[in-house]
From Swiss-Prot:
Binding site for S-adenosyl-L-methionine: Q190, Y218, N223, E239, D299
PROSITE patterns noted in UniProt: SAM_MT_RNA_M5U, TRMA_1, TRMA_2
Enzyme Commission (EC) number: 2.1.1.-, 2.1.1.35
Name used for this protein in its record: tRNA/tmRNA (uracil-C(5))-methyltransferase
HAMAP family: RNA_methyltr_TrmA
Organism: Escherichia coli O157:H7 (strain EC4115 / EHEC)
Amino acid sequence: MTPEHLPTEQYEAQLAEKVVRLQSMMAPFSDLVPEVFRSPVSHYRMRAEFRIWHDGDDLYHIIFDQQTKSRIRVDSFPAASELINQLMTAMIAGVRNNPVLRHKLFQIDYLTTLSNQAVVSLLYHKKLDDEWRQEAEALRDALRAQNLNVHLIGRATKTKIALDQDYIDERLPVAGKEMIYRQVENSFTQPNAAMNIQMLEWALDVTKGSKGDLLELYCGNGNFSLALARNFDRVLATEIAKPSVAAAQYNIAANHIDNVQIIRMAAEEFTQAMNGVREFNRLQGIDLKSYQCETIFVDPPRSGLDSETEKMVQAYPRILYISCNPETLCKNLETLSQTHKVERLALFDQFPYTHHMECSVLLTAK
């Protein structure tokens, strides 16, 4: 695979290899055949980041080869959304001959939605001033004249200039209902929107008929919490990043959901609060004991669950675990399988043509 060519003819083979690999990794814990969810074969990534290479009067997007570290020119990127590809061409055309906008520009980040909105961030090794803002506003207006629904942001050391806003609102059809998700620049969002829809619908399916409340750790902008709220009496969710918490609160209101409570704290801190080890001012007014959480949902970072959180989640009858790293999932399962068994197993091809796998398990108490 090269940045400008996807081996789409190999899609089925690479997916089949992942299924075999996941089954092998999960063999000590389950003999289930994974439920498999396919990605679009191209234009599946909703965000992308590129370094900018200055070559005389020219400049262009590049990425670095992971093995050789050599730079690769990228003029089109079929893994990314069609809107990102349009913007890549338009941004280079708009910046190349503009001394103010191109000077010390070293990176451009793109974030897009299925609803055809975009945030483009330009990163600089220089101070950004009023002249930069004026030129950036002219570029934004020129892009919009091309029917590109785009918001521009300038970033430099300790500086962020959002010309209009630093977010876009995604609209996803999830099990017959449209979900609105505010996505903030430089915050985590699911990269493959089509797969995100399938993950949300799978999570809804495995939790249908649930009793009691749901606890979610690492909730981000409320991606899963809000979609799953319809299956539970109440949802209690934790997140540490301020922009994500703010987006989650907006999303609760935008989706007219009244049974989700977001707490800004780390999973490790919440574990301490639940165990009565520490009290937190952030929990004032929230009666943790009133929640009857029968199900816990975790979508941890690549490092997986720490040992204290492992112990904490074992107290719940059902564990829904989405993993971007099956190796750490299996490491966690060495502990979790002592008290729980695997009821459902799914593979989501979030990152086609790479070795990365996204998978999920539903665990129930033995």
